[in-house]
């Protein structure tokens, strides 16, 4: 791939930002059938203009639209296709679903319940068909109002495959290999359209890779008759096939352990939950050396991620974006704390191969989230740290 200056950015964020209250209110009315598409679109446009201007004023050299056109980051694919076997009237799912509210605890929803595609595990009623390119729509508007490059996030094949009920869809797809091959073809078309429109930085969201170090997730795969090692290799192959042949475009891949969070009833503060546990050690050598993406955006905000030792396995042509700042904790990191952790990481990977970001996005439409003020304080701390470490 030809070099792109965005390959070496020292600062990043993962995509989603805290939705303004007014936008969340319009989203809720739209889901209940009480607001039109036009009203929702106008509210989204207004909020996106504002959040892009704020990112620029806070010193970010790359911006996103905050994912303000999505309920969840996973809609970057599910809203683009038809063919999944989903129940009718799922608009209110986000208001009604039952989530674990216990602080500082593993928290997973019931993936087998009737809900939206990919948010829950759905089969296919027919082969998927592309009906729109939501990331392209997002990029065109974001870049039209931005003074700096706009970054777009797209859900990767691994998560899509993990949330596909293949065993109930064998009359449509021959199995996971057939399904994933089709997903790659669909997403390559979406990416090609983004690149043609001028997008220079595309982030693949791949939270499912940490399933391959998490015992609960591995047991779940095996219970479905799947071979985790085969799934792992298929996903790497698919992620690489997705991005080949787009010179001059920066591709990042984001890996995390889930972005669940809740409110501590004792303190009233936002505190973490999580979906998976396990360090990168067991997958690092294969994953870091086989993926072709220029930027590896890695969650590193808690002990669940393990130490920095696996970074010694990162090839010399990649940047590791350290996700050191928590998006699911009201506690504020300090510049000194972040500099200390970057220094620790640099013992295993040279400082010129490191960058800094939050550990994940700041949350979807139904998430318990930081306040906007808390989010900007955290983003400002990242900017200040980057300026001190890399000048």
Label for each model-derived stretch:
Residues 1-391:
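Domain-level signal for soluble alpha/beta catalytic cores
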């Amino acid at each position: 791939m030809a070099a792109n200056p965005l390959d070496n950015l020292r600062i990043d964020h993962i995509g989603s930002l805290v939705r303004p209250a007014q936008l969340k209110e319009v989203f809720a009315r739209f889901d209940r059938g009480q607001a039109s598409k036009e009203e929702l679109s106008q509210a989204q446009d207004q909020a996106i203009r504002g959040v892009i201007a704020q990112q620029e004023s806070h010193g970010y050299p790359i911006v996103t639209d905050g994912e303000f056109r999505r309920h969840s980051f996973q809609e970057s694919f599910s809203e683009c296709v038809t063919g999944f076997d989903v129940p009718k009237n799922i608009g209110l799912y986000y208001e009604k679903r039952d989530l674990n509210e216990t602080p500082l605890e593993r928290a997973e929803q019931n993936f087998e319940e009737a809900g939206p595609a990919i948010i829950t595990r759905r089969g296919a009623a027919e082969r998927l068909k592309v009906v729109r390119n939501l990331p392209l729509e997002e990029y065109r508007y974001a870049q039209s109002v931005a003074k700096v490059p706009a970054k777009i996030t797209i859900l990767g094949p691994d998560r899509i495959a993990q949330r596909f009920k293949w065993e109930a869809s064998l009359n449509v797809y021959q199995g996971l290999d057939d399904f994933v091959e089709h997903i790659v073809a669909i997403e390559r078309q979406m990416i090609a359209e983004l690149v043609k429109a001028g997008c220079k930085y595309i982030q693949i969201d791949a939270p499912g890779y940490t399933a391959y170090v998490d015992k609960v997730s591995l047991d779940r795969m095996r219970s479905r008759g799947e071979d985790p090692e085969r799934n792992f290799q298929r996903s790497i192959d698919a992620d690489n096939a997705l991005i080949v042949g787009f010179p001059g475009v920066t591709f990042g891949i984001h890996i995390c352990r889930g972005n669940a969070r809740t409110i501590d009833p004792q303190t009233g503060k936002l505190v973490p939950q999580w979906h998976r546990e396990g360090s990168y050690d067991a997958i690092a050598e294969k994953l870091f050396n086989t993926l072709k993406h220029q930027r590896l955006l890695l969650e590193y905000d808690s002990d669940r991620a393990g130490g920095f030792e696996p970074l010694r396995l990162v090839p010399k042509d990649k940047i590791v974006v350290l996700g050191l700042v928590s998006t699911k904790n009201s506690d504020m990191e300090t510049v000194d704390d972040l500099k200390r952790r970057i220094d620790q990481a640099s013992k295993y990977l040279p400082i010129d191969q490191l960058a800094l970001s939050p550990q994940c996005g700041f949350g979807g439409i139904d998430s318990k989230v930081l306040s906007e003020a808390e989010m900007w304080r955290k983003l400002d701390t990242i900017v200040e740290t980057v300026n001190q470490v890399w000048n």
